[in-house]
Each structure stands twice: as structure tokens, then as C-alpha cells.
Amino acid sequence: MRFHRQGTAATVGVLLIVLLGFCWKLSESYGIVSTALPHKQPATKITDTPSIRWDNYHEFVRDIDFDNSTAIFNSIRAALRQSPSDIHPVGVSYFPAVIPKGTLMYHAGSKVPTTFEWLAMDHEFSYSFGLRSPSYGRKSLERRHGRFGNGTHGDHPKGPPPPPPPDEKDRGSQKMLTYRAARDLNKFLYLDGASAAKTDSGEMDTQLMLSNVIKEKLNLTDDGENERMAERLYAARICKWGKPFGLDGIIRVEVGFEVVLCDFSADNVELVSMLEMVQPNQYLGLPAPTVISKEEGWPLDENGNLVEDQLTDDQKAILEREDGWEKTFSNFNAVKSFNQLRAGTAHDNGEHRIHIDYRYLVSGINRTYIAPDPNNRRLLDEGMTWEKQLDMVDDLEKALEVGFDATQSMDWQLAFDELVLKFAPLLKSVSNILNSNGDINESIAINATALTLNFCLRFEPASNNSDEFGSGKDFAVYQYVSPYQALKTDADFLIWSSAVSVVGEIVDAIYKVNDLLIPEVYSFMTDNTTSSDLIKNVETARSTIDGLIESLGWIELNYRCERQCNWDEVCYTPSWGPSPMGMTEPGSHNEGFGTHFDESRQRLVINSKLQCININDLMVNRNH
């Protein structure tokens, strides 16, 4: 009996070991894991989804129409790019952004910031803003027409700078500060479009919406709403709201990209340089400008203008000398401003020191109806109810709780750039053929299908092709939108679904043109004739392609520099708001350089033909 009990126990033990081993193997094979979250694991943890393949990708597409898809697509492509952000100025999205450790940023002002303040990504931006040279001679009588600003990279009030003080010694010294990111600043919100435009036509809606919601959420009843400049009020509220979430600040575009940094503590940035800015007249050892006033014996009328025929010989000599100095300094100041333009233009293709984590994009698109025209839409439209605004801010808070890591995000901008590089030349070439001058004949069909057939045959299956492999239009779409990283968040799926929609429309259009015109080519090749429907088919094909090009709204298809610019020129895209080329107000009928008033939109828009400009153009524009 003892032997039997021992044998039974041994047998049971062996069976238990085998059973445990089998369960372990089963869990390994089928991915059985605990559903409980680890200690302090956030509920917002993202997880991988099943692989998206050619035969199942439709199952993962989110519900988004073509207009919203193009809006998402173009917002992604314009992100952190200066020229596209000005061409498509009304942004409606918040992009999570990271400024890596070691990145240098700049500020020009009279003191070291102790609260939130503006920093520039380019030193030319801060230098141009901060170095405000005194005027000499007759120019000193004029109110200096400087850039409007809110203290961007400095601490000047909004509006034109005041007239120069009567004495050089009374001018407050300006400091040029250089900061270095002490860590990865991984909780920035980049506001797309021309978000530093200082306008009321929609460009600043992302800040206004956030400010309004914050006011109610934090019960900010006495924060100087009526006394403070709008964007300083927005910045103060946003930083106050974001502090519990670790918000580093916001990023906007003006002429170059600027950062509103919420906290200048050593944990975030370190001050690596602080220079007193030297005026050119000081550097050259020239005296301060002569004070031209009645008190100093100068003949001035009631409007403060010189009475030229009452000038003494000494006064004439002073003016002749100082007017000459002013002419020289005007060249210096023009180059200073042009350098800012050049630095900004360098980011037309991207501000690559800032990285975007697209996984946590928060956008007004697809939440309510937003007009697809980025020149004529508003985030704060009637469809954006208070409840929807609260939902957007709630999504921002959830994203900030997680923090951003661009290395874990698919680079959607890169993926979309590839699509445009592939399809823009094809679509434009087909359009040019279909819009050829002269009579419609078989050559149009032959030339157009030479392009479309090469595309379609790539995906055409042989008669004995197995259904095991993808083919046709469906596979064509999949080939171009197949993600190279797993989609993990709602934003990922929304962005990818937008790509599916956009590429689907493009593929459909290419196939439609091919199906319309190939029979005409076949008829001409076999019978040396075309059908009576040739003209109608070409016109249908033309309207299909041209309508698609208009609906896509791709900048490359509509905007181009007039020529290859010379080394001393930049291809200038007008900006909205402060600029060395002057302040451009979207709602004005006064056309600024490179803009025109669009009657249908009732606002200024940027001309499709961009111009090369140099320092002389800047000086001429300033004098008008």
C-alpha cells in the first residue's frame, strides 16, 4: 500500500508538471497575457493591432469623408513648414512636439525672462527683432514703422514701436540671450497654420479656443482679460493650465518658428550666452543722433515737420551729415531684416530641429463640419459646440499625461511627401495633355494613356492569376498606403484613413481616364479611326483630373516660384502678421506684396506665382 501511494503521488506530480508545461507552452504560442495593468501603469497605454494586409485593410479604415481626408493630409504636410503654413494659414490642429536636448533657442529683450516668454528657433529672428537702431537726421522725425509684435522674442508692446527717445543714453540696453534645452522638452503643442499672425480671421483660433476653455475650467475671473494683449493672455492661460501636465509650451510660425516656453527653470533650459546688443553707430564710434526739436532751436511746424526754408547753415550741415549716415545704416538694417527672411525661408521644407509625435494629434477635423478651404475656415465655427471644445481639451490633457516620443511615431509627413512626389507629376502631366491647345484628336488619347496605362498595368493580373495575391485598384491603394509602423492610436488610424481616402480617389481617377481613352487608342490602332465619343470622353477625363487636382489642394500643384532665385535672393512666401516686408492683414482690401484680395473668400490670399526678392526689393517695399 505504501508503495502504491508513493507511486500514485509520483504519477500525479509528473502529470502536474506536464500540465503546467503544456499551459506555459500554450500561453507562449497564443500570446496569453494578464489583462491587469501593472502598478501605476496608465490606462492610456497603447497596444499593437493586428497586421494591416492587402486583403483586410478596409476593415481598419475609419469613417472620414474626402474633404476631411484632404484637410488632414494637407495639415500633416504643412506642419512645421513655413511657406505651406502661410499658404494654408488657418490651422485647426494641435500637434504634439518635442524639442531635443541640446537645441539652441534665442531671445532678445531688456531682461532675463522669469515667467513664460517667447524664444526664436533662429538667432536672426531674435536679433532682427531686438536690435532697434536709432534713426539719424530727417528720419529721426518719423515714427519708426517697425514690426508689430506682442513681445515676440522680446518685451515690446503690441503696435508700432514708439518714436526714438530724445537721447541715446536713455535707450534701455537690449540683451541677446541664447538658451540650450537641458533635456528633451517632450511636451510641446505645435499650433499649425499661421498661428502667430495676430489676426481675428481664424489663424489664432487654436489659441483662442484653448484660452476660452481654460478660463472656464480654472475659473479665471480676474486675469487681466481686458488689459492684456490677446496672445500674452492666451500664453499665460495655456501655461497655467498646462503646468500640472508638465506642458513645456507652444510652438508657432511667424517669419521662422517661435516657441512660447512656459518655464525657464534650469531643469528645462540653461542660459549659455547673454550679450549686450551693440548698435552699429556705437560700434563705429559715431555720436548719438542730434535731437531735432523746438526746444533745441529747430524750426518745426505744428505737425512736427521741418520747415526747410528756416534751417540755419549749421542745421543744414548737420542734416546733410546725418542723412548720409542714415542711408548707410538703412542698408545695414535691410540686410538684418533680409537675414531674418532668409532664415525663415530655410524652413519652407521643414523645421527639422523640432520633432512631431503624430500618435497624439488632436484636431478639429472630423469632429464637426469644417470648411475644406484652409484660407476660409474656422475652428471656432458654429459646429464646434462647447461640448466639442471641452472634448478637444480633454484629449489634449490625456495626451500630455502620457508625454511625447517622436521616435515611436510613424513619420506621416515623410510618408505623405512620398505620395505627393509620386502622384503630383503624374496628375499634372495628364492634365497638361488633356488641356492641350488645338483640336481634340487621337494624339491626346494616345499621350494620356501612355501615362495611365503604365500605372494600371502594374496592377493588372494575368488571366490565370490566383486570388491568393492582391491585384487591381484595391491593391494599388494598399501599395501606396501600407504603413511601415504599427498603428496604435486613434490619431494614427485617422491619419492613415485619410491617406486611404486620398489615394483611393487618385487611383480611381487614373483608372477612369484610362478606361475612357484606351478604347479610343485601340480603335485608332486597329481601324485608324476614333469613336464619335472621343471629344466627350476627353472632356470627361479632363474634368475628372482637373477636379481632383483642385480638390486635393496640394501646394505643389498650384504654387511655384516664378524662377530659380539667385544667390542674393529668396523665393518669398508672404506671411500673415509681422514681417520685414510689412504687416499683412488677411481681412484687408489693401493688397500686400505677393497677395491679392479674393472676392469669393473676402480676404487676402497668397499669389500662386511666388516671387524672388532681394535686399533692394525689401527696401523699396519699406518706402511705400
Swiss-Prot record:
Localization, per the record, is: Secreted
This protein's source sits in the domain of life called: Eukaryota
Q: Where is this region: Disordered?
A: 141-174
Q: Which InterPro entries match?
A: YOR389W-like
The protein's UniProt keywords, in alphabetical order, are:
Glycoprotein, Secreted, Signal
Signal peptide positions (record):
1-29
**Glycoprotein listed as a keyword:** yes
The record lists glycosylation at N68, N150, N219, N366, N441, N447, N464, N528
GO cellular component terms, alphabetically, are:
extracellular region
Q: Does the keyword Signal apply?
A: yes
Q: Which PANTHER family match?
A: ENTEROTOXIN, YALI0A21131P
Official protein name in the record? Uncharacterized protein YOR389W
Organism taxonomic ancestry: Eukaryota, Fungi, Dikarya, Ascomycota, Saccharomycotina
